[in-house]
UniProtKB/Swiss-Prot annotation:
The active site is at R173, S249, E345. The lineage of its organism: Bacteria, Pseudomonadati, Pseudomonadota, Betaproteobacteria, Burkholderiales. Its cofactor is FAD. This is UDP-N-acetylenolpyruvoylglucosamine reductase. Belongs to the MurB family. It is an enzyme of class 1 (oxidoreductase). It comes from Burkholderia ambifaria (strain MC40-6). Cell wall formation. NCBIfam families: murB (TIGR00179), PRK00046.1 (NF000755), PRK13903.1 (NF010478). It comes from the Bacteria. One of its GO terms (cellular component) is cytosol. The gene is murB. InterPro entries: FAD-bd_PCMH, FAD-bd_PCMH-like_sf, FAD-bd_PCMH_sub1, FAD-bd_PCMH_sub2, MurB, MurB_C, MurB_C_sf, Oxid_FAD_bind_N.
Length: 349
């Protein structure tokens, strides 16, 4: 009788090119790569003598990474699939997705199955497993709002752990997995709590303008209307990584205290800002970069997108060093002109 397949077996791909595995399209090579389709493969890594001693990098869609050099270790390509409703009660559905699921496809699937809530996060690149690391957000919604829990494998021990929101310690484009837990875990499944009573989030003018252009009053908008509007806005503003390499918004919108904001507004009365809890103020990083004259400018083979100053692009053949040099030049100018620090969103490897 043939033996059943071993779900923990890992097939290594030596000298694996990474350009197709990062949305910037940066040419780098991994000493090894491996496609991971089962959580058991992550759990068995620490016992595999071929890779246990090597540096390990879990990669989803590669939409939040800048490769600055070849990776002398094993890149673990998270392709764990699956979407299901794990349970429901009178108030909500609890929906689980595999870490390797494409985020946008998952959002579309929830809508198709009558479970709205995530539509403001449509078309954000990357995978479900990467979403909690960054606490992705757009158009007035952060992922943490509907997050329930996740399952992650600690790579050094193979132990599976469940994390609730408190353990994830979500912040603005931040989480435990981007700080203390960076590089230690592989997220294999994420569960979301989607309320059965839908609450539209239409606080951003871009969304209401797009709805208006479609002849839809905000109070009459359906979840599908909001989804379609967000998709249209993102496609109009952001370049397709398949056509022009990029990682979406490259910098976080900086958050400053009230005293710093008052001093800045005294010098720059038209500065774009958004009040935050606790008296803090969020600034529009794209506006700051544009005001410094960077929109459309190039440095080496990297450039600032000509329609969205928050997006850095690969004009063809850009290296990670090109992208970082451009980012640092922008940071220097914004610091000199506004006294504000810009923090990159992508992780540099």
């Amino acid at each position: 009788m043939p033996m059943p397949p071993d779900d923990s077996a890992l097939s290594l791909l030596p000298d694996h090119p990474l350009a197709a595995h990062n949305t910037f399209g940066i040419d780098a090579t991994a000493r090894f790569a491996a496609r991971v389709t089962h959580a058991a493969q992550f759990a068995a890594l620490h016992r595999d003598p071929r890779v246990a001693h090597l540096s390990q990098l879990v990669l989803g869609g590669g939409s939040n990474v800048v490769f600055t050099r070849d990776f002398d270790g094993v890149v673990l390509l998270d392709e764990i699939a699956g979407r299901r409703v794990v349970r429901e009660d009178d108030d909500a559905w609890y929906v689980e997705a595999g870490g390797g699921e494409t985020w946008h496809a998952f959002v579309a699937w929830t809508l198709e199955h009558g479970m709205p809530g995530l539509e403001n996060l449509a078309l954000i690149p990357g995978t479900v497993g990467a979403a909690p690391i960054q606490n992705i957000g757009a158009y007035g919604l952060e992922m943490k709002t509907y997050f329930d829990s996740l399952v992650a494998v600690e790579l050094a021990t193979g132990r599976s752990e469940r994390f609730d929101a408190a353990r994830c310690a979500f912040g603005y484009r931040d989480s435990f997995f981007k700080r203390e837990g960076r590089g230690r875990f592989a997220i294999v499944a994420v569960t979301f709590r989607l309320p059965k009573r839908w609450t539209p989030r239409l606080g951003y003018a871009d969304v209401t303008r797009e709805l208006d252009a479609r002849g839809i009053a905000p109070d009459a908008a359906t979840p599908r209307d909001v989804f379609d509007a967000v998709v249209a806005i993102r496609r109009a503003k952001l370049p397709d990584p398949l056509e022009l390499g990029n990682a979406g918004s490259f910098f976080k919108n900086p958050v400053i205290d009230a005293a710093q904001f008052d001093a800045l507004r005294a010098r720059v009365p038209d500065v774009v800002s958004y009040p935050q809890p606790g008296g803090q103020v969020k600034l529009a990083a794209g506006w700051l970069i544009d005001r410094c004259g960077w929109k459309g400018r190039t440095l080496g083979a990297a450039a600032v997108h000509d329609r969205q100053a928050l997006v850095l692009v690969n004009r063809g053949g850009a290296t990670g060093a090109d992208v970082l040099a451009l980012a640092r030049a922008i940071q220097d100018d914004v610091r000199k002109q506004f006294g504000v620090e810009l923090e990159p969103e992508p992780v540099c490897v």
